[in-house]
């Protein structure tokens, strides 16, 4: 990590208002309560049909409802916390419009995005690619961001955990290889906000992180992504257990990349009343003295990307799919990891999931 030897503490901020059109969710407690948060990622920017048709979630960025957000961003940044924007996410279309060989089309969609990032002085952009996308299109976007914003602008990606392992389904399309992207543009990518939840991984032990390290990833570039509240998705890990996992990862990997949380507004244990408590607890675990690891916990030798299969001992990822759907795919000869990942990719459709697995 170029700017600090300390692990990152990243929090996503998508639900910008309390439920039922309530008041804005304030970011200021993250800095007034000494949480040690290092990065806030505002989500989600969508590049919609028609050049210049950009929304922050469902509304124009300059909508009155966002005034508090833009005002608080300045205070958060003044405290030393970097504030980034998330592009894409579950709502598809942003990357499709920025992809393809038509340069004029790319420019027409990219320029308004660039102007928005400049207007609000974001410190970086997180690319959450949850739709089929090409590597050349992503490389072009990364190169253009670097050219327009300079060397200090943070460029991150948000893959699911399976995307960093060989031969596993993920959300960015069968032709998209994050390991190849890292080889091509790793020098421009600050880190990966890796999703260890919603059936794509497991954060209750170090096993999935260890597996990613074993196929050649650098620990300083892999941030372990966590669900902050079970209402936000499957795979939530209770606080004290998560803190124990973090301590083990820091002992195993002195350059551990840190943790991120999805998302801020209802993070436990404080919930909607005190959501900053999650960050404060994670911050203590990330800043506490590092225990000395036993010899058998030292990192295995790094192998070239793609060598070896996913370790068979990986704990199953938590998910919400019917057991019968998973078993159907297992009967066809696929592992539980593959079955859950394919169901995630196809919205739970067993037939489409089987087709995806056989295609791979």
Which positions does each model-derived feature cover?
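Short basic/hydrophobic patches in alpha-helices and adjacent helix-turn junctions
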Residues: 214, 244-252, 328-332, 345
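C-terminal accessory extensions appended to soluble enzyme cores
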Residues: 243-247, 257-260, 270-311
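Surface-exposed patches in mature extracellular/periplasmic domains of secreted proteins
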Residues: 129, 258-261, 341-342
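Short, amphipathic alpha-helical interaction segments embedded in low-complexity terminal/linker regions
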Residues: 290-360
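Chitinase-like catalytic core of GlcNAc-active glycosidases
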Residues: 2-243, 253-256, 265-282, 289
